[in-house]
């Protein structure tokens, strides 16, 4: 049996009596007691997540922009100011999603990328292959000397500034999807990004791994609640945010995963997967579902891989959960393209087909329920 990878915060999680699980080969906290309370902390105050299993990768070289113009489906031409971030899919030549990632632009010869934990080695091998094939001459460096803490919620930024006063001046004017580098902190040089995976405001803080436990402890002392993967999943699902490996993978086009907005076909770029996307187009709709109640009660919970039955053919739930914010069973589903918002479809739950309403994503954003 292969030993699990540990983040630099593993001992801190165990000291807090976290319930630990194997998450893609990493020993990670699923909760620290009450998943519901952790979820609510992020929606109403501030919570923090150890996301150090994700991998920071630095790209340096004079042709780094040209490399990303070819490597990813979104357009790095949008990255003009230092610290600007871009969410994109990394595609294979067949148009399938190798990973979803965030690219940060700092200078014309330095970009930084954060990739998912379970795909990191595959991604880096693919980046190296593209670099070599295209003769870009980049240095591609995985930075396992960094850890990442995501601090999320309406009070998250203020609590980060209380904990790291030097970050206030550098990040108080930061717009969403921008990052700043903050030097001179007790926790080393930080990269603080106004990004997240919860549908709330907040920061994702890249910190030297040797200092992350001190940062985590200081944030907790300033009222930021530790949160596990359980709350992270309910929060991201409410926020309409995809999970790689569930909602899309190498067999699924971003156009069939609700990610058409991350694909830029307008610019004349020869990016990997473009030909396949233009040839195949959109073949399925990616929608939100809310399970209907009978006599005030839902007949089950929507879960991944449940069959969806529509007048236009069958589909499948890709992610599902009980929403603490809505008190409803919610899901993402890939369904025939003729299915539209407002339709009622049916989900196979055990031996029953239960009605569910098709809604526009997201379900919840900034503490407000949007789907009805």
From Swiss-Prot:
Keywords of this protein's UniProt record, alphabetized? Aminotransferase, Transferase
Q: Which InterPro entries match?
A: GCS_T, GCS_T_bac, GCST_C, GCV_T_N, GcvT/YgfZ/DmdA, GcvT/YgfZ_C, TrmE/GcvT_dom1
Q: What SUPFAM superfamilies does the database record attribute to this sequence?
A: Aminomethyltransferase beta-barrel domain, Folate-binding domain
**Which GO BP annotation is one of this protein's?**
glycine decarboxylation via glycine cleavage system
**Molecular function terms from GO:** aminomethyltransferase activity; transaminase activity
Its EC number(s): 2.1.2.10
GO CC terms of this entry = cytosol; glycine cleavage complex
Q: Which reaction does it catalyse?
A: N(6)-[(R)-S(8)-aminomethyldihydrolipoyl]-L-lysyl-[protein] + (6S)-5,6,7,8-tetrahydrofolate = N(6)-[(R)-dihydrolipoyl]-L-lysyl-[protein] + (6R)-5,10-methylene-5,6,7,8-tetrahydrofolate + NH4(+)
Q: Which residues form a coiled coil?
A: none
A Pfam family found in this protein is GCV_T_C
Q: How does it assemble?
A: The glycine cleavage system is composed of four proteins: P, T, L and H.
Family to which the UniProt record says this protein belongs: Belongs to the GcvT family.
Per the entry, what this protein does is:
The glycine cleavage system catalyzes the degradation of glycine.
Looking up NCBIfam families in the UniProt record yields: gcvT, PRK00389.1
**What name has this protein been given in UniProt?**
Aminomethyltransferase
Q: What is the name of the gene encoding this protein?
A: gcvT
């Amino acid at each position: 049996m292969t030993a699990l990878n540990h983040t630099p915060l593993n001992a801190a999680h165990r000291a807090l009596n976290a319930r630990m699980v194997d998450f893609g080969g990493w020993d990670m906290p699923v909760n620290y007691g009450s998943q519901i309370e952790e979820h609510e902390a992020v929606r109403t105050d501030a919570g923090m997540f150890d996301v150090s299993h994700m991998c920071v990768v630095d790209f340096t070289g004079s042709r780094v922009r040209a490399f990303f113009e070819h490597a990813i489906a979104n357009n790095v031409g949008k990255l003009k100011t230092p610290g600007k971030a871009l969410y994109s899919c990394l595609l294979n030549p067949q148009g399938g999603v190798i990973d979803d990632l965030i690219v940060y632009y700092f200078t014309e010869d330095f970009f930084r990328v954060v990739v998912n934990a379970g795909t990191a080695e595959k991604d880096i091998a693919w980046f190296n292959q593209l670099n070599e094939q295209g003769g870009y001459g980049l240095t591609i460096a995985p930075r396992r000397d960094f850890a990442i803490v995501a601090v999320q919620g309406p009070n998250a930024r203020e609590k980060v500034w209380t904990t790291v006063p030097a970050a206030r001046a550098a990040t108080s004017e930061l717009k969403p999807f921008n990052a700043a580098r903050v030097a001179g902190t007790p926790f080393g040089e930080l990269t603080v990004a106004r990004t997240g995976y919860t549908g709330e405001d907040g920061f994702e803080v890249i910190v030297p791994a040797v200092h992350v436990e001190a940062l985590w402890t200081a944030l907790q002392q300033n009222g930021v609640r530790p949160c596990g993967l359980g709350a992270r999943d309910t929060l991201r699902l409410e926020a309409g945010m995809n999970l790689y490996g569930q909602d899309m993978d190498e067999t699924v086009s971003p156009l069939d995963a609700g990610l058409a907005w991350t694909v830029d076909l307008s610019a004349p770029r020869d990016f990997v997967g473009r030909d396949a996307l233009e040839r195949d187009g959109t073949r399925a709709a990616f929608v939100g579902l809310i399970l209907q109640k009978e006599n005030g009660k839902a007949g089950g919970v929507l879960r991944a891989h449940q069959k969806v039955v529509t007048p236009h053919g069958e589909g499948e739930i890709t992610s599902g959960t009980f929403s603490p914010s809505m008190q409803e069973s919610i899901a993402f589903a890939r369904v025939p393209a003729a299915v539209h918002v407002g339709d009622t479809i049916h989900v196979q739950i055990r031996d029953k087909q239960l009605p569910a309403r098709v809604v526009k994503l997201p379900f919840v954003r900034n503490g407000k329920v949007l789907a009805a």
